[in-house]
Amino acid sequence: MLDTGLYWRPLGGNNIDQISGHCYQYTCVERRENQTVKTSLLIDVGKFDNYQALGVDNAVAAVPDITALLKDRDNGLKAIFLTHSHPDHLNGLVHYLRAGYKLPSLYGGRYTQIVLEDLYDFYKIPQKQRPRFIVIKDGDVKRFGRLRVEVLSASHTCFDAYGFLLSFNKVTVYHSGDMKLDNSTFFKKPTNVKRLKQVAKKINYVVGDFCEIDHEGIAYRESDVYKKFINLIRRFRKKKIYMTVYPTHVEMYIVAFLAALKLGFNVAFHGDEDFYDYMKVLHKYGINFENLAKNRIKVFERLPDDLSQLGNKFAIIGTYRKLDDKYWINSKDVLMFVTARLRYAALKKQAENRGIKTVSVVDEPLLRGSGHAFMGDWQILKQIMNRAVYIPTHCPDFVLEEFYEVGQLAGFNLINPLPHNNMLYKFGKDEYKLVEKKPAVWLVSQKDGNMVKTLQCPTAGHGSIRNTYSKRRTLQKFKIIEYKMEKKRGV
């Protein structure tokens, strides 16, 4: 039996050695008319792609285990809030629907709703089974009994990304969602720092996106990525440009397009079906590249069979997963940008074997863009919310452990013990405590829609995704950050 108060449990936000399948439970417990009443919310229900490493075959994804919340009415699950549209925060919902579960109302941005509807269609989820979706925007306030949720815009690599302020009994939590501090975003709202400043004294806890906390400085701004593209194209003086982008990070579609437009390059989009699905989503959202061009350049939604239609100077924006020999014609006049670290080495080798000049994220880290706060972003936020207890999420456990010493040196009041999946904390106004620690559980969604329960286990080096983080490289980055901090302080 839980005492009255606000409780928080990460169900999928901190994998042992990889990140994915994010899901966080907030539960407020109160007494009403001599009865104990629970009100629970979830923030995000993502999927974990490296399901093979969990030891289950014939599968399509792994998802955090929320079955107890869905089956037990006493838990009072009222809603699921969605920070944004990326698969590791959103796609778990579809696998629960495929397995026959009924979900509560969903709250998310309009872009997230469009992506989700596309997923429903792909998995053939019947209309009557699809949960109610309430579109939210920056500044909205929703109440569930005495639990208050305020919506704050967040700058990320997709549209309509949000963080949330959750308040209950004089306890306020800022759940950041994936975000960075960037007010140069194209067609998107920046992180609502103004509102955070207004309520900073009331914020007791920050559940933060520490995905890239091992990067020093401020997260890359979209305007700087745009300028970098332009400068590199001008420097190498190539007339045929190929820009690889990560399919779900639509900000890069737009940044690459605007750079090509600025320099007068005709543009063709080319990729696999996943890439074109996101192009369709952009259209539904209202982003039309032909309209953006205003007849200044030619725009092709798909690569034409006859490349001569593109003219003498053109840029192809596409995914690294769809390449063919059309790109290698007159290779000496081609410049390829590899903006995704994933599989960049193989792609770069293909290009170099054909005599193509390649610039990758290893050469120019700025090219990959960023949707996550760096160390500098969090130091700025710490100055604003200087009374809060900071709770790192969205990163492997070893990153948390390596960050702990650096975080204390930087003045962060970090939660102790650090959060692992399925640990339950009680958040009080002046203190917190670890209430419960259980083994983390995942459900592996199989091809027939059924789900198999399995315990979390170390996954690095196993399955389809061998490594998402380098422990050695992470430690080196933290050592550099720590050295610079100590030097600045004269230690």
Where are these regions (language model features)?
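Hard-cation-handling environments
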Residues: 214-336, 343-359, 367, 374-377, ...
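His/Asp/Glu-rich metal-coordinating catalytic cores
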Residues: 2-79, 88-262, 266-270, 276-295
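Short beta-strand element of the conserved SAM-dependent methyltransferase core
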Residues: 24-26, 164-166, 424-425, 432-434, ...
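Short, surface-exposed beta-strand/loop "edge" segments at domain boundaries and coil↔beta transitions
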Residues: 32-35, 323-327, 486
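Long, low-complexity, intrinsically disordered segments
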Residues: 485-491
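Non-globular, low-confidence helical/coil segments that flank catalytic cores
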Residues: 99-110, 118, 123-138, 143-150, ...
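A short SAM/SAH-binding and catalytic strip from SAM-dependent methyltransferases
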Residues: 82
